[in-house]
Amino acid sequence: MVPAARVTAIDESLGESAVLLALAATARHALAAPGARPPELIVGHGVLGRLLARVALAEGAFAPTVWERNAARARSDGLYSVVAPDDDPRRDYRAVYDVSGDAAILDGLLDRLAPGGEIVLAGFYPGELSFDFPKAFMREARIRIAAEWKDSDMKAVLAHIDAGRLSLDGLVTHRHDAADAAQAYRRAFEDTDCLKMILDWRHAA
């Protein structure tokens, strides 16, 4: 049993895509801070990066640029541009959202930031983050951390889905029976083609 406040009613038609709702709400939470600018650059084209871009578009933002080093993950179905960082000459981004999980990335992002711009750390970073203070000082850079979604974020995501503004299609890429969990975990962490893995417990004893 869980408190009713921790349960969300969803449409059965969402099917397995419903497992992405919390992550979509996390993306929306990063975008919804007071005074937040919509992303001009998103770093990382995994599931969270894709959801950030999709939710931003659902909320009326212009299409962002997305950085992705792995060419196999570069497809965006024409919704926005996905490029390798080295192929992007721009150095005046006003809002950069990082979901790469790279703890050493801040200095490189500061090089691409416009004066007064903001870097939003929306991923998870296993180690300490540091940056070159003079570089940030000269740009009067702002650094913001986005954490766990709130009820208002989930409601907004569900409203976007109901209105047809947001799709979760194409993000669950792999499925395994729960009995094959060891193989599934290896694939989820080692196969760059795996965006989201689902374990199917329907046949578990």
Identify the residue ranges that each predicted region occupies:
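Glycine-rich phosphate-binding loop and adjacent beta-alpha segment
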Residues: 103-163, 201-205
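Adenosine-nucleotide cofactor-binding segment
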Residues: 42-45, 53, 57-108
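C-terminal hydrophobic helical "lid"/dimerization subdomain
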Residues: 107, 151-205
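Hydrophobic/small residue at the entry helix of a nucleotide-binding pocket
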Residues: 26, 48, 56
